[in-house]
UniProtKB/Swiss-Prot annotation:
Predominant location category: nucleus
Gene responsible for this protein: pou3f1-a
Task of the protein: Acts as a transcription factor. May play a role in neuronal differentiation.
GO cellular component assignments: nucleus
Taxonomic source organism: Xenopus laevis
Record family assignment: Belongs to the POU transcription factor family. Class-3 subfamily.
GO BP of this protein: brain development; regulation of transcription by RNA polymerase II
Sequence ranges of Polar residues compositional bias: 107-117, 129-138, 151-160
Entries under Pfam families matching the protein: Homeodomain (PF00046), Pou (PF00157)
Stated name of the protein: POU domain, class 3, transcription factor 1-A
InterPro entries from the UniProt entry: HD (IPR001356), Homeobox_CS (IPR017970), Homeodomain-like_sf (IPR009057), Lambda_DNA-bd_dom_sf (IPR010982), POU (IPR013847), POU_dom (IPR000327), POU_domain_TF (IPR050255), TF_POU_3 (IPR016362)
């Protein structure tokens, strides 16, 4: 009969006849259910007496009715149910204080999620009598209503929220404190966005910086080393080149822009004093100008190269003095000439002497000799 009571209709249009079993052969009065109810109360009282002082460890029966539920006061149970109710009234009064105290402790010991489930179940199984109290009629196990969340309506969701409110002292203040950090972060983010330059500003600055750098006569490597000497951040020539070409990330462009701007201001302020300008230029790796060698001087170097492809330091010095060139220029020219000779000679072919190669200038080319033999 307890399982049948779960599926009773929710309206109050039931007849006043005693509760009948659905089978037509066996007709039972409503007092049978009330007798079972009385037995369940007596068993629960015996359990409380046996475990005196430890009633918190007990859990009420799954289908144990609440003393204030509608199953005891409903008019649809009939007149005989009223007489049975008066018979167990004394036991229920003794049970009322301990049972309510035990149930309140169980509710507070539950987690917020299980607490919310209990109230959600009470919302769907609403009392059938308008004179019922706010307590739920029956205490159900949570495993029977695992899919109840999708069935809840707007009223149930508001009830679900209201049952979580007692867990907080001030829900309004709590919600404000939770929502305030994102607003603070958003304000801080807006402030940082205002300070950061836009992409158009970076593009314009990169263009102006390149023009000013070329006008002042500094290379990209000079700027990178000068930044390391002045501000402690050494940048390579590739980094400065990528900045001017707008190939760095936006974050790195924003970091490098103020340093380059300070370097430009420092350079512009020292334009009138050559000593300071030379000092800044000396901090970087100064690139020498490309040396232009005249045709007569180049021929003299070629003749010396045919005699000695790898001259000694003394020979380089004497040759530089005779040609009125710097010693470093003559040394670099011989290095480049030897590399050129290696590129011209195929790999695996023995390298002939320089005199033999250039002494055969009057002989016909090799391809001409091959064509003559074929004919």
């Amino acid at each position: 009969m307890a399982a049948t009571a779960q599926y009773l209709p929710r309206n109050n249009s039931l007849p006043s006849n005693p509760l009948m079993h659905p089978d037509s052969d066996r007709m039972h009065q409503g007092t049978t259910y009330r007798e079972v109810q009385k037995m369940m109360h007596q068993e629960y009282l015996q359990g409380l007496a046996t475990n005196a002082g430890h009633h918190m460890s007990l859990t009420p029966h799954q289908w144990l009715p609440n003393p204030a539920s509608d199953w005891g006061s409903g008019s649809h149970l009939g007149v005989q149910a009223e007489h049975a109710k008066s018979g167990v009234q004394s036991n229920r009064e003794d049970l009322s204080s301990g049972f309510h105290h035990h149930r309140s402790h169980l509710v507070h010991q539950q987690s917020p999620s299980s607490h919310a489930w209990a109230q959600s179940g009470g919302h769907h199984l609403a009392p059938m009598s308008p004179s019922s109290n706010s307590h739920q009629p029956l205490i159900y196990s949570q495993s029977s209503y695992t899919n109840l969340n999708g069935m809840l309506g707007p009223q149930a969701s508001s009830l679900h929220h209201s049952m979580r409110d007692p867990l907080h002292d001030d829900p309004g203040v709590h919600d404000t404190q939770v929502d305030s950090p994102p607003q603070h972060l958003g304000h801080h983010q807006d402030h940082s966005d205002e300070d950061a330059p836009s992409s158009d500003d970076l593009e314009q600055f990169a263009k102006q910086f390149k023009q000013r750098r070329i006008k002042l006569g500094f290379t990209q490597a000079d700027v990178g080393l000068a930044l390391g000497t002045l501000y402690g951040n050494v940048f390579s020539q590739t980094t400065i080149c990528r900045f001017e070409a707008l190939q760095l990330s936006f974050k790195n462009m924003c970091k490098l822009k103020p340093l380059l701007n300070k370097w430009l201001e420092e350079t512009d302020s020292t334009t009138g004093s050559p000593t300071n300008l030379d000092k800044i230029a000396a901090q970087g790796r100064k690139r020498k100008k490309r040396t232009s060698i005249e045709v007569g001087v180049k021929g003299a170097l070629e003749n010396h190269f045919l005699k000695c492809p790898k001259p000694s330091a003394h020979e380089i010095t004497s040759l530089a003095d005779s040609l009125q060139l710097e010693k470093e220029v003559v040394r670099v020219w011989f290095c480049n000439r030897r590399q050129k000779e290696k590129r011209m000679t195929p790999a695996g072919v023995p390298h002939p002497p320089m005199e033999d190669v250039y002494s055969q200038a009057e002989t016909p080319p090799l391809h001409h000799t091959l064509q003559t033999s074929v004919q």
